[in-house]
């Protein structure tokens, strides 16, 4: 159970577009389910409609029966497809994790694991998820997964490589905080809802929602370790050339002062609609504006 203080922090850091999109997704999902139920329930009444249609248009009864059966089978196929899509989304990430990930236990790094438990307490997560190191970075789509009621947290293995190269654990600290933020916000469940139903109607919705979730998680991580520290971690870990002391301030200043023309803004928007995560410059720019 989260305390009032924890709930206040979660509310403060959540992206303003996240709740409206989640509500819209739930409403659209409910409407979709109701429409399917109404269509399926109306199949039994099609026989009477078929008789009226036969009298008015003088169609062959066999043709009408065939059309009714086709409609019935089509509705059943739609229901089965939605169900299979839900099952696929539920088990896809779990399958990827079981095939590509390796467990990370307390004995490997007691200090990091102790901090991990401390962060879980700060987020109001009573039972810390088991840590997995994701070796397949391209499929690191969902950081929080559930397998047989066990919760897991997937961490990017390359983050350990960066931490080892820079001799600094800050990047791991941020990675853990960012991923725990996704769990604290229940992002996996909402993303599953959108991927199963809403994204079938509006394909770009999934990528937009994933980007919003990423911004929310960044904000929550920044709330705990500091905005400037997060910017530094981004620059040091993912944009090493921009992190060099003589370039850092210049780079941040360019991000703040960058002005896009109308055509450039349209091009950037269209590109972002196809991306599931924001670019690192976009994430840094969002943190700077906090």
Segments (PLM) and residue ranges:
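Catalytic Zn2+-binding segment of zinc metalloproteases
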Residues: 179-195, 226-229
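Hydrophobic or amphipathic, alpha-helical segments that drive membrane association/targeting
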Residues: 1-137, 203
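Soluble periplasmic/extracytoplasmic beta-strand elements of cell-envelope proteins
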Residues: 132, 152-154, 175
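Active-site recognition of the HExxH zinc-binding catalytic motif
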Residues: 116, 170-187, 217-218
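C-terminal capping/extension segments of zinc metalloprotease domains
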Residues: 1-10, 229-232, 244-290
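Active-site scaffold of zinc-dependent metalloenzymes
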Residues: 141-168
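Post-HEXXH active-site segment of zinc metalloproteases
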Residues: 186-214
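Short helix/loop segments within enzyme catalytic domains
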Residues: 107-128, 203-260
């Amino acid at each position: 159970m989260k305390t009032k203080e924890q709930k206040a922090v979660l509310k403060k850091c959540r992206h303003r577009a996240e709740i409206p999109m989640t509500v819209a997704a739930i409403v659209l999902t409910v409407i979709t389910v109701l429409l399917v139920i109404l269509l399926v329930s109306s199949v039994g009444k099609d026989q009477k409609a078929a008789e009226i249609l036969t009298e008015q248009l003088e169609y062959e009864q066999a043709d009408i029966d065939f059309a009714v059966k086709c409609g019935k089978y089509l509705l059943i196929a739609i229901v089965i497809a939605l169900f299979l899509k839900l099952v696929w989304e539920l088990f896809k990430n779990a399958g990827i994790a079981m095939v590509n990930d390796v467990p990370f236990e307390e004995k490997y790094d007691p200090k990091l694991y102790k901090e991990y438990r401390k962060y879980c307490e700060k987020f109001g997560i009573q039972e810390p998820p088991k840590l997995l190191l994701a070796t397949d970075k391209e499929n690191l789509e969902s950081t929080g997964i559930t397998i047989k009621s066990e919760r897991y947290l997937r961490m990017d293995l390359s983050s350990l490589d960066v931490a080892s190269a820079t001799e600094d654990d800050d990047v791991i600290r941020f990675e853990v905080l960012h991923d725990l933020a996704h769990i604290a916000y229940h992002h996996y469940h909402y993303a599953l809802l959108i991927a199963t139903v809403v994204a079938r109607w509006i394909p770009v919705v999934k990528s937009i929602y994933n980007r919003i979730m990423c911004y929310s998680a960044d904000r929550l991580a920044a709330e705990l370790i500091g905005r400037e520290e997060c910017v530094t971690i981004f620059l040091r870990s993912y944009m090493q050339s921009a992190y060099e002391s003589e370039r850092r301030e210049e780079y941040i200043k360019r991000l703040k002062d960058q002005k896009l023309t109308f055509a450039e803004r349209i091009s950037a928007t269209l590109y972002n609609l196809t991306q599931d995560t924001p670019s690192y410059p976009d994430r840094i720019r969002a943190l700077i504006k906090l």
